[in-house]
From Swiss-Prot:
EC number in record: 2.1.1.199
Catalytic activity field: cytidine(1402) in 16S rRNA + S-adenosyl-L-methionine = N(4)-methylcytidine(1402) in 16S rRNA + S-adenosyl-L-homocysteine + H(+)
Localization per Swiss-Prot or TrEMBL: Cytoplasm
GO cellular component, one term: cytoplasm
Job of this protein: Specifically methylates the N4 position of cytidine in position 1402 (C1402) of 16S rRNA.
Biological process per Gene Ontology, one example term: rRNA base methylation
Protein's UniProt keywords contain Transferase: yes
Binding site for S-adenosyl-L-methionine: 35-37, 55, 79, 100, 107
Pfam short name (any one): Methyltransf_5
Source superkingdom: Bacteria
UniProt protein name: Ribosomal RNA small subunit methyltransferase H
Length: 313
């Protein structure tokens, strides 16, 4: 219960105000979490409105099942399954899609989930602990090259190769030391390699982020759900995405810009601008948490919210 109370939804009012443009529409919350955005969306919907939420985390599903509202339903799956899941429910078009990316405070603050380097726990990091390969299982088999690529590309860590070598060297000692299966030991290994210090950031931050992204296929799933959202949005429907690190935000920014721009055409060709297809999206805005919100919830500091609207049928 304590963890539930600690979670604060970032950009709550701003996101829901941007999302809900038609109170009787069908909306999707791709990341239910602990339900902050979903409850606020339901409060704005008319009796004929509908909200379908997604989450991989079994604890999020438990929380969602406590919402007694006929307009609401929850899907225990990744938002990457959105297109098929909505089709199975007879939904062809929606009025808005909300994505609040990253991990929630209850996930980070629970050592048993293995997301945090601040408290020792099992090295898991899966959003859904019942499916897929845990961080410990992946670390037990990954090559130096694969480890380097993941830590470099998903953590933007300049010491990726050195960290990868240290992890493989530790694995060679498994017969004597046992498997590398705790967050505390992983953080310690990284700390011994990363000698430089970024102000206010633990040396293990980038490596933990990278492994979490890899284990959960976060960036691949994000690209899938953005494509799905574009095809599902009705004319006038909104796509609202809140991201918390540069890799996510870069993907969202490029996606929105690509679909809000007219297609490139060779100027030497006899094609008029009016003959080109209209881009499907219009970028509405980019927003950041207020100083007051960041003061109340420091984890909101890195949040960026991007909003786009479908302008073509």
């Amino acid at each position: 219960m304590g963890n539930e109370l600690q979670h604060r939804t970032v950009l709550l009012d701003e996101a829901v105000e941007s999302l809900v443009t038609r109170p009787d529409g069908i909306y999707v919350d791709g990341t239910f979490g602990r339900g902050g955005h979903s409850r606020a969306v339901l409060a704005r919907l008319a009796p004929g409105g509908r909200l379908i939420a997604f989450d991989k985390d079994p604890r999020a599903i438990e929380t969602a099942q406590g919402i007694e509202d006929a307009r609401f339903s929850i899907v225990h799956d990744s938002f990457a399954s959105m297109r098929d899941a909505l089709a199975a429910r007879g939904v062809e078009k929606v009025s808005g899609v909300l994505l609040d990316l990253g991990v929630s405070s209850p996930q980070v603050d629970d050592p048993a989930r293995g997301f945090s380097f601040r408290a020792d726990g099992p090295l898991d990091m899966r959003m859904d602990p019942t499916r897929g390969e845990s961080a410990a299982e992946w670390l037990a088999r990954a090559s130096v090259q694969e480890l380097t690529e993941v830590i470099r590309d998903y953590g933007e860590e300049r010491f990726a190769f050195q960290i990868a070598k240290a992890l493989v060297a530790r694995r060679a000692e498994s017969d004597r030391l046992g498997p590398l299966d705790t967050t505390g030991e992983l953080a310690q290994i990284v700390g011994h390699v990363v000698k430089t210090r970024e102000k206010g950031k633990d040396p293990a931050t980038r490596t933990f982020q990278a492994i979490r992204i890899h284990v959960n296929q976060e960036l691949a799933d994000l690209q899938v759900v953005l494509d799905a959202a574009l095809s599902l949005l009705e004319q006038g429907g909104r796509l609202v995405v809140i991201s918390f690190h540069s890799l996510e935000d870069r993907i969202v920014k490029r996606f929105m810009q690509a679909h809000a721009s007219a297609p490139a055409v060779d100027r030497r060709l006899p094609i008029r601008a009016v003959d080109l297809p209209s881009p499907p999206l219009k970028i509405i805005s980019r927003q950041f948490p207020s100083e007051a919100e960041v003061a109340a919830n420091p984890r909101a500091r890195s949040a960026v919210m991007r909003i786009a609207e479908r302008v073509t049928p």
